[in-house]
Amino acid sequence: MSRIMLAGPSGIGKTTFANIIARDYELEFQSGSMRTLMPDMKEVSHADMLKEDKKVQYQKDFQLLNLRNKKFGNLDSFVTDRSYLDSAAYFIYKQSSFQPQCEVDNFLDLCKMLLCRQCDKLIMFDFPTYMIKDWVMADENDKRIHNKYFQHLIAGIMNQVLSIWGSKLRFEFLHHSEKFWEAPDV
C-alpha cells in the first residue's frame, strides 16, 4: 500500500513528478486538482478564483476538501499531484483575515486528519528564496499566477502549516536541487 501526495506551489512540477512516480512504481495517478474535481472551475484562472467573493471561496474550499476526501478515502494505492496541505495553505491565504480563528483552526484540523488517514508519504516541493529570480514556471494552460513572490508566499505558508501540525506527520521535503528527479523511497 502506497498513498503518496505531493504538495507545493503552482507550476513547480507536482503533476509531472506524480506521473513519473506513477509510471516508475506502477501506481495509479489520481488528479486532486480543483479543475479536475470541480469541472465548472476548469476554465477559471487562479487569479480569478482568488477574486471571488470570500463566502463563495469558503464554500468551494470545503467542497474541494470533501471531493478530495471522497476520491482518496477508499483508495489503497495511488499518487496524486495535490494534498490536504495545499488545501490548508490556500485556506489560510484566502480566509485567515476574514474568518474567526476557530474556523481556520477547524479547517486545518480537518486537513491534518485527512492527511494522516489517507497519506503514507507527503512529498513537498519547497520554493526557497534563491529560486525567485531564476525559476521558470510551467503553465501550459495559462491559468496560473505567474508572480514568483506569490508562489514563494504559498510555499512559506505550507512550511508554516507543517510546523503548526508538528513532527508527528510522516513527510519528506523534496527541495529543488540536483536530487530533484531522484526517485523517493516508496
Predicted regions and their residues:
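P-loop (Walker A) phosphate-binding loop of NTP-binding proteins
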Residues: P9
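Conserved lysine of the Walker
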Residues: K14
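Conserved substrate/cofactor phosphate-moiety recognition/catalytic segment
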Residues: N19, R23-L67
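Pre-Walker A (Motif I) flank of P-loop NTPase domains
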Residues: M1-R3
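A glycine- and Lys/Arg-enriched "phosphate-lid" helix/loop adjacent to the NTP-binding pocket
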Residues: K94-L162, E172
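Charged phosphate-binding loop/patch that engages nucleotide di/tri-phosphates or the phosphate backbone
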Residues: Q160-V186
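Glycine-rich phosphate-binding loop used to anchor ATP phosphates in small-molecule kinases
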Residues: Q57-C116
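Hydrophobic anchor at the beta1->P-loop junction of P-loop NTPases
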Residues: L6
